[in-house]
Regions:
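Conserved acetyl-CoA-binding loop-helix of GNAT-fold acetyltransferases
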Residues: 81-94, 113-122
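Short acidic N-proximal helix/loop "leader" segments that mark the beginning
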Residues: 1-2
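Acetyl-CoA-dependent GNAT
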Residues: 5, 9-78, 89-91, 95, ...
Length: 124
């Protein structure tokens, strides 16, 4: 049985599940309030990936003057190696292009080899 994935804009109702993923992965996690504030800002793009109705991953980007700053990207350990991160990035770029973003940038730890491989594969 394969899962059905849906990429959609993050809502405030999603922020609790997103915060749980964030806390399980990062040493300095964003709070639920930080995600709620970010997804309310019209200049931002915050997306989630649902796997059969469960939040499996998320990404976020701030947009300013044609630049997209990718601020967050995480996939729950239970859903890794399924292509979710790439789907999220591609969807985020589409939303960014709709907001006239012409260049994207991000930061990643040198030790995060899977993320580096994904970003390089996508041309970052």
């Amino acid at each position: 049985m394969s899962l059905k994935y849906v990429i959609r804009p993050m809502t405030e109702d999603d922020t609790f599940a997103v915060e749980l993923i964030e806390q399980g992965i990062f040493s300095l996690p964003w709070s639920q309030k930080s995600f709620a504030d970010a997804c309310r800002n019209q200049g931002n793009v915050y997306l989630v990936c649902e796997a059969d109705g469960v939040i499996a991953g998320y990404c976020g980007m701030w947009t300013v003057l044609g630049e997209g700053n990718i601020t967050n990207m995480a996939v729950s350990p239970d859903y890794r190696r399924c292509g979710i991160a790439q789907m999220l990035m591609q969807s985020m770029e589409k939303y960014g292009n709709d907001k006239n973003v012409t260049s994207y940038f991000l930061e990643v730890r040198q030790s995060n080899l899977p993320a580096i491989a994904l970003y390089e594969k996508m041309g970052y």
